[in-house]
Amino acid sequence: MRISVRQLTEADWRIFSEIRLKALLSDPAAFGSNYALESKFSEAEWRRRLRGDDSAVFMIFDDETPIGITGVAVDRDDPAKKTAFLWGSWLEPEFRRRGLSNLLYKTRIDWAKNHPGIERIVVSHRASNAASKHANQKHGFVFTRTHEKTWTDGATEDEVCYELKLKS
């Protein structure tokens, strides 16, 4: 097993779409989006999601085989552009519980630290997602709040929010 992570580019749109859709199908409760919506995306939309300086999508590989995906972006809701948010993490089930999420967290946190102006990172998950809770806390994220949310699968459940301050 040779594990590597790399940032995707527009040229990677096809593998991005395949792994993202696979993730949405296999673990729909883990995401703020859904397969029905994203399966209708055009090539142009997949490419757009991989373009730009204010976001990054990373794929984790076992040798040359993609086994997971994750993303980070500057938060559009922060007019000062000082906040990044983590989104869309997923690993193939047989690669879970091997510490690989540590590599995904480190990659995204490093991206945010190296992105000019970012002072904090936010992340959230469903209250029932114990694995995300553990991973967020393990990487220094501090609980900030919960609020009720209706998720894209129609379920209503609390969203648990955290932040990691990068600069004081």
Model-derived features: positions:
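Conserved GNAT acetyl-CoA-binding A-motif
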Residues: A112-S124
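Conserved catalytic-core motifs of GNAT/GCN5-like acyltransferases
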Residues: V122-S124, V142-E159
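Acetyl-CoA-dependent GNAT
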Residues: E10, E18, A23-E94, Y105-T107, ...
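Conserved SAM-binding loop
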Residues: V5, H125
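Terminal substrate-recognition subdomain of acyl/acetyltransferases
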Residues: R2, L8, K138, T152-S168
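Amphipathic alpha-helical recognition patches that constitute DNA-binding helices
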Residues: I15, F85-L86, R120, A131
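Residue-level detector of beta-propeller blades
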Residues: Q7, P66, F143-R145
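Conserved active-site alpha-helix within GNAT-family acetyltransferase domains
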Residues: R98, N102, A127-R145
